[in-house]
Each structure stands twice: as C-alpha cells, then as structure tokens.
Amino acid sequence: MKKFFALLLALVMVLSLVACGDRKTDDNQGDTNTDDQQGETTTYTNPDDIDDNMTSEDGKYEIAFVTDVGQLKDKSFNQGTFDGVKLYAANNGLSYKYYQPANGDQATDDDRYDAMKAAVDGGAKVIVCAGFMQGTALEKAAKEFTDTKFVFIDGWSLGLDNVAGIAFNEEQCGYFAGYAVVKEGYEKLGFTGGGGGTNPACIRYGWGFAQGANDAAKEMDKTVDLNYSWEYGASFQASPELQTMVSGWYSNGTEIVFACGGSMFQSVAAAASAEDGKVVGVDVDQSSESETVVTSAMKGLSDAAEWAIAKVYDGTWDEIGNAATSLGVAENAVGLPTATWSMENFSVADYEDLFQKVLNGDITIDNNSEMANPAEGGLTNVNVNYIGG
C-alpha cells in the first residue's frame, strides 16, 4: 500500500519543492517546519510526527481539510485522509488547517458549506473534502469559489473544472478480507457498516466482503454464516447500542466482525475484547488499535490525498479536474496490510496470489454500490442474516 503512486509522488514532491521556494510552516514548537535550524530539509514519512495544528506566519492556511462526520482522529477515514494533507504540506513547506463542520454527526449541508467557506476565507488554495455527504455543499462552494481547487475523496465528478472526484474500489479490499478470514478458518462472520446503508463506499466494502467469503467457502465446500447490519451506524460513531449489539453477536457464536465505519471500530473492538472475538478493520491498518484485529480492508487515503494535492502544484490538475478517478488493485490503492500479517492458514503468499488474480481479471468482483443487502446477491455459500438499519 505504501508503494501506491510512490514514483509519481517522489517526482511531484521534487517539482513542488522547487515551485514552493522558501515557503515555510511554523507552529509554536516548530515541529512541522520542513527546515531545521541548520537549514537542512526534513522529509516526513510518518504523519504522526506532524502536528495536527500549526500556526502560519501570516495567519493564512493554503491547504485545507474538511472532515466527514465522526472524529478527526478516528484512526480510519478522516484521519487517513488528513494524514495525506499533513504529509504533503509539511514536506513542501506549506501551511495547512483542518475544519470540522458544526453540529457534529448532525451536520447539515449548510454546516459543510460554512466549513468550506471558512477555509477559503482562511486562504485555502486547495480544499480536501472527505466523504460522499460533502457533495451538495461542495458543489455550491466550488461554483462560488472558482479559484480554489477541491479534492472530493470518496466522491464523483461534479462537472466542474475545479473539482476532482477520487473514489476507490472498496469491493476489492472487502473481497480480500472476506476471502482471507474464511480461508483462515472463521465460519461465523459479522458486518456492521456506517451510513445506514446509503454510503456507497461502505456498501461496496460490505458487498465485497460477502463475495470474498462466499468464494472462499465455495472452494472449501462449506457454508458460512454472516450477520449483516446497518444499525447504529448512521453517524459513524461509537455507541453503547452498537457495542451491545455486537457483544450479542459474539456471545451467540459470531467469531469475527468487519467494523466498517470510522469510530464504530471502537465499539466493535470493545465488544470483541470483552467476548474474546476478532475484528476486521477498515480504511487503514487498525492492528495497532486493538489486539483483536486479524486484518484490515485498506484503501490508500493518505497517498491519494497527497497525489491529488500535488497536481495543484505541478501543473497537472487538468488530468483529474472535472473528472472522477477510481483507484483499485491496478494502482495498488486497495488491499490488506502485509507488514502486520497475523493469519496462519492464509499466508501472505496466498494473498498475493489472490491479488494477482483480481488484477489479471481472473476473478471478477461485482461493484454494485446499491447492494446494501447481500442476501439479495445470489450468494450460494453464505447464509446472510440481514438486520438492516
């Protein structure tokens, strides 16, 4: 995953450093300044080494991030995207700031627009907006602020030259996770998703997970069970209700649950810890967050954000502006984390072989963004208990 667009990013980073000249970023401690006291350049590779908040010399912030619902530090979608913003800014001497729409998980389109306007008023030349719920507000803002570039993560083309839609083939990494855990030996699975069954990315994750489990079970001549729920996930938040539901699953025999929805992971991991269950993480490698994590269905959020921002500064924005870019196995933008591999019956070599089959087209994964209920998908080796949302 870290090799995603690596050569391209290396090139645009060099070009951007030349273009940016002597621009610097400063916070109170100087941690995000790319020039040290001897004038040497620091190259950041770990976003955790970069402050979330920085103070620019002129009070303006050139690169902005507008969060999706949920927490900034959700160890998932918001944080993964913001990591790319921080890395590009810090490594190129640019100021950056994040903006959270008012009213939290009850944020309206007006709240999201206000956050984008605040970013523009604060000096933003490029605004990275996370989540499909940003669409209406983003279109309004982009039409009004035509000199500002907008990167729409998990988005689509809005027919505007200053908007780049960046989406992922989540069904592919979801498939890898479902296939892997069944091959590992798990037969009683769960899925709990964010967005109430309306979020296209979460739907693709879950539908891919079910397809992967089905294909693995078919190869093993067995049938597996899958609890499938959109309950308590509309706001992508952790909640006692979600933890109670998933605890009930574990106590009734469910072995592993795919936690697909930002901070919802916290509730699922807590339930797993209490009930001796296991978890599949989402968006980023979440193995460091809980010992219950077996694997994670990942997409290259940080790399994609860096790549898209770079195009603002290297003069190639026209390649992605007024277009929808979809990233998947062909770009090495989705997958499972091999550096923290813990599975024993399904090896890294097995995974790499599976990845290659998908890449070559030997395995076709349906990407229906409306398949919120996999019980309607014609699966032959998965018994789906659909709970809805």
Give the ranges of each region predicted by the language model.
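Positively charged n-region of N-terminal signal peptides that target proteins for export
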Residues: 1-9
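General helical structural elements
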Residues: 7, 27-28
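Enrichment for repetitive, rod-forming helical segments
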Residues: 9-10, 119
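C-terminal motif of bacterial Sec signal peptides marking the signal peptidase cleavage site
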Residues: 16-19
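A residue-level marker of the well-folded mature domains of exported/periplasmic proteins
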Residues: 22-23, 27, 35-389
